[in-house]
Regions:
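An N-terminal assembly and electron-transfer interface module characteristic of large anaerobic redox
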Residues: 1-465
């Protein structure tokens, strides 16, 4: 393991600070520089420990974006309509995925705004693209942008016209709209809900369940999958659909189950539209919360609750095994690894691990109990943002001895010993605890090429990079 040295510089380039806790120069200046980006949880506010403002984007690209997620609908074609500058990122994503044949763009130019023909541009642009495709897609995802909202475009009319022109194609509205990030549904919530708007009503089958809202497939040996399989349910998941017809079969499911927080709103919408029952199973590292969620799900499904005997003991033994291996190695966790980083920090700290940092830009309501507990019992735990402008100067320049759980924690601490998973990686239940600990042991023993891996877009999806 390597010595931790995190070098950082002030924006003016006049002072040098050593991120290992030893001042190199003006200690008062260092403390002033760090005070709003390095907050002990005992002094932090909930749910927004950091001020919102200008944001920094690190070169960590493992989380999925709207291009990756839309491609989960098999055989569908994506059409993005926005300015050329904004198109650059999504075009590169499609190219990196090797899915250019399922991806098209329409560039909005200044004269379109001035001439007031934004609606016509969308309708005619989409029409031209569809007519030139070698194969007619069963579905088209049309992504409009903030420009259409600023211009007051009649989106309902646009989609009505497209459906009239192409009655054999299913259209849905998707958005590349950063102005929606601070109110209403977030872009992530909205995109996950759009995945299921194309499902058409059909007869409901009582012995079928759909796991919805995930970018990554649910682990086959997770508590959720075992519960469904052991009780004879046919399981649908968009990640396993290979044809558009397979995708449509999800509509007949009696139960919709989500466990990623951003998928909850979409599950409620789907239930209201198609009539199935939606159940949200919270992702957590708390034994009590895991068992409570699975018991409540069993009640909804009308099946016996799982047998939890031995599960807690197995987790405790895995914690002891992992702690005996890594000892007091400093641990950093970030929100890209899973939706409940504070829950993981609480589990590890209670077991004696040396968790020093959690990288997160905001906290969800589900984390309030863990936040309060950590404030009371581990007030020294540091919360650090990932998008604050000062973080540009706080990424480690030299390798460190940290064990990181998550890509952004690895990047900011500069370690090659890290768990390389995003969005929970398909884990849920007790299996999430056991698999996370196994991955931590693996990360401690084996180095990865952090700076190369974290720059690959969309961990777990197709990539030709």
């Amino acid at each position: 393991m390597l010595r931790h040295v995190m070098d950082s510089y002030d924006p003016a380039g006049k002072k040098h600070y050593a991120g290992n806790g030893q001042a190199a120069g003006d200690e008062d200046g260092r403390e002033e520089f760090l005070k709003d980006v390095c907050i002990p949880i005992g002094e932090a506010s909930f749910p927004a420990p950091f001020a919102s403002g200008l944001e920094y984007s690190s070169p960590v690209r493992g989380t999925w974006n709207i291009v990756h997620t839309g491609m989960l609908i098999p055989e569908a074609h994506e059409i993005f309509i926005c300015g050329a500058g904004c198109l650059r990122g999504v075009v590169l994503t499609a190219a990196e995925m090797g899915t250019q044949e399922r991806f098209s763009t329409v560039a909005v130019r200044e004269h379109n705004l001035l001439d007031g023909d934004m609606e016509e541009l969308v309708i005619d642009g989409v029409t031209d693209i569809i007519n030139k495709l070698k194969k007619r897609p069963p579905a088209v995802l049309v992504y409009t942008s903030c420009m259409h909202h600023f211009a007051g475009c009649d989106l309902d009319m646009i989609y009505a016209r497209l459906r009239e022109r192409f009655p054999d194609i299913d259209f849905t509205d998707c958005y590349m709209n950063p102005i929606m990030r601070k109110s209403g549904l977030t872009p992530d919530q909205l995109m996950r809900s759009r995945l299921y708007t194309l499902l058409k009503e059909r007869d409901i089958r009582p012995d079928e369940a759909a796991i919805i809202g995930n970018d990554l497939p649910t682990d086959e040996d997770s508590d959720l999958m075992l519960l469904l399989k052991e009780n004879g349910f046919k399981i649908h998941e968009i990640t396993s659909c290979r044809t558009y017809e397979e995708y449509q079969e999800m509509a007949g499911s009696r139960f919709y189950i989500s466990y990623y927080p951003s998928a909850k709103a979409g599950g409620d919408m789907l239930s209201q539209r198609l009539g199935g029952t939606h159940f949200y199973l919270p992702f957590s590292f708390s034994y009590d919360e895991i068992e409570d969620g699975l018991r409540r799900l069993s009640d909804v499904l009308g099946v016996p609750a799982p047998d939890f005997s031995g599960k807690r003991q197995a987790c405790e033994e895995a914690l002891e095994e992992t702690l005996s291996l890594i000892g007091q190695t400093p641990v950093a966790i970030d929100y890209t690894f899973c939706p409940r980083p504070l829950s993981l920090a609480r589990l590890l700290l209670d077991a004696g691990f040396n968790v020093e940092r959690v990288y997160t830009d905001g906290l969800t309501g589900e984390e309030k109990e863990d936040f309060d507990y950590l404030q009371a019992h581990f007030p020294q735990l540091l919360l650090m943002p990932t998008v604050h402008p000062k973080m540009r100067f706080l990424a480690a320049k030299e390798p460190s001895d940290y064990l990181a759980v998550g890509q952004k924690a690895a990047y900011f601490t500069g370690t090659d010993h890290f768990v390389n998973i995003v969005e929970g990686g398909g884990m849920i239940g007790y299996e999430a605890v056991l698999r996370t600990l196994s991955l931590m042991r693996e990360a401690y023993l084996e180095k990865k090429d952090m700076r190369t891996l974290v720059q690959i877009k969309g961990w777990g999806c197709e990539s030709c990079v």
